[in-house]
Amino acid sequence: MRIMGLDVGTKTIGVALSDPLGWTAQGLTTIRRRNLAADLAALKELVRRYGVEELVVGLPRNMNGSLGPQAEAVRAFARHLQAEVGLPVHFFDERLTTVAAGRVLLEADLSRRRRRQVIDQVAATYILQGYLDRLGQNGV
């Protein structure tokens, strides 16, 4: 079963995809945000092309666990996405995923320009892999 992970930001959406068995996550692409209709259409096409059956959206919580304005915006986007694609949408706590992604990219010695191009994909990969690992631990 293919699962898609999303890191939804104000300017871009990082996209990751699981392998067909749902064990590992890999970065797929970064979508430059334009407007809601275009963003949903781009994601719907990826869902169709890769046979995605579930979506996982990173939920940006504050360090104390509360939800701020960005989390509410992500939840609203996820509601629109679920209505558009008709698939289950799950949330996964994304605290510090972008920080972790940035560290990995720095250690990989990528240029600043290249890091900016892929950081959202890598963050989406962290989100999705965390979700897949949790599924595996729960035996689902």
From Swiss-Prot:
Protein purpose: Could be a nuclease involved in processing of the 5'-end of pre-16S rRNA.
PANTHER family for this protein: POLYNUCLEOTIDYL TRANSFERASE, RIBONUCLEASE H-LIKE SUPERFAMILY PROTEIN
Q: Where in the cell is it found?
A: Cytoplasm
- The principal location of this protein is cytoplasm
InterPro entries, A to Z: RNaseH-like_sf, YqgF, YqgF/RNaseH-like_dom, YqgF/RNaseH-like_dom_sf
Quote the protein name from its UniProt record. Putative pre-16S rRNA nuclease
NCBIfam families, A to Z: RNAse_H_YqgF
Pfam hit, one: RuvX
- State the family it belongs to: Belongs to the YqgF nuclease family.
* SMART domains named among the record's database cross-references: YqgFc
**EC code:** 3.1.-.-
The enzyme's first-digit EC class, named in words, is hydrolase
Q: Does the keyword Endoplasmic reticulum feature in the UniProt annotation?
A: no
Q: Name one GO biological process term.
A: rRNA 5'-end processing
> Which Gene Ontology CC terms are recorded?
cytosol
